[in-house]
């Protein structure tokens, strides 16, 4: 079993997706004075470290560094400055352990259902925190990036999606959304692209050199049930479990997206969770094509099988009480139990809908007239041909950043999902 995991992670950590390296345009380096790392920066980084965290191969834990006091802070500062001066990290910092964490979904017997977390040396993480703070002071990340940004979080992105749904419904306009999935984004991003992105956003060359030193000659060993595999090199991707990796990844997305973003910001990003928004199907097609081509040129890959499309419109899949509209089948006034046909937009009685039992939200329901006498869910609306390699599934609800977004708007579906999760804890 240990060798199976070793073979899986060795392949994942050393193979890039195919991409054209000629797309990396030459960028000017930002030369500046190399500022020494101060004890105040190191002390602030140590204070941010959590206690009782798993250690790397050396066995040094954060609790030891916190207990070392002023003498330990000075020693760590000297080591970090030596790395900056020499452009090389200690050999022990290059090694790590790889442990499995189940993603919470998928077949538990498949390797793809697990995320490999690297247990790095805690002294290295101190240097990463110092470098991260300095890089954040230099780069300007777009306001539509909510992942790993100060004073931003998942609730902000979810709030914006719901507000857009309400505004579009108020104006009787359709809102098209694409929830784009990036395949193995952190594990497969080429490191040449990372260095290019840092330089493109104006990061000082000495900082780029320090980050490159952190990734030079790195290796890891799989740790499973108290046993450790043979070591293997890691040549692709950013470190899962690293303090600096999230910032490096959003810098990559920021740098490559500047080439095809324009006009009003009609996209939301939370690290590798991307939502594209448009007023029409054609507009959404154009956005998906631009992002897909732009990211795949730089070594990232869009997982089209997991990318979903949602058409948000007023009354999508909802049962309403209204006597103003005739039933699309029998022409009598509709009542409480009615549903809108997604094809002809007529309201249909429950008894004429062909649905047995209580009506449920279904944004792709079609009446018997539109289905040639066989009412049901529309085959046409379940998939939308976007001409980007394959058809994308059109859904009426989607779990985005832990919350449920429904095509009809509102938070009812999210509330039901939370109630179901709560009841599941008692089973």
Regions inferred by a protein language model and the residue ranges of each:
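Conserved catalytic palm subdomain of right-hand nucleotidyl-transferase polymerases, strongest
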Residues: 52-60, 98, 109-119, 156-199
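Catalytic palm active-site di-aspartate
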Residues: 56, 95-98, 115, 145, ...
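Short, conserved micro-motifs composed of acidic
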Residues: 302-322, 374-394
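Active-site palm subdomain of RNA-directed nucleic acid polymerases
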Residues: 131-145, 221, 246-277, 335
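Basic, alpha-helical interaction scaffolds
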Residues: 322, 384-427
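Catalytic palm subdomain of template-directed nucleic-acid polymerases
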Residues: 66, 184-201, 274-298, 313-317, ...
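PHD-type zinc finger and closely related Cys/His-rich zinc-binding mini-domains in nuclear regulators
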Residues: 323-379
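Surface-exposed loop/turn segments and immediately adjacent short secondary-structure elements
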Residues: 1-112, 118, 126, 399
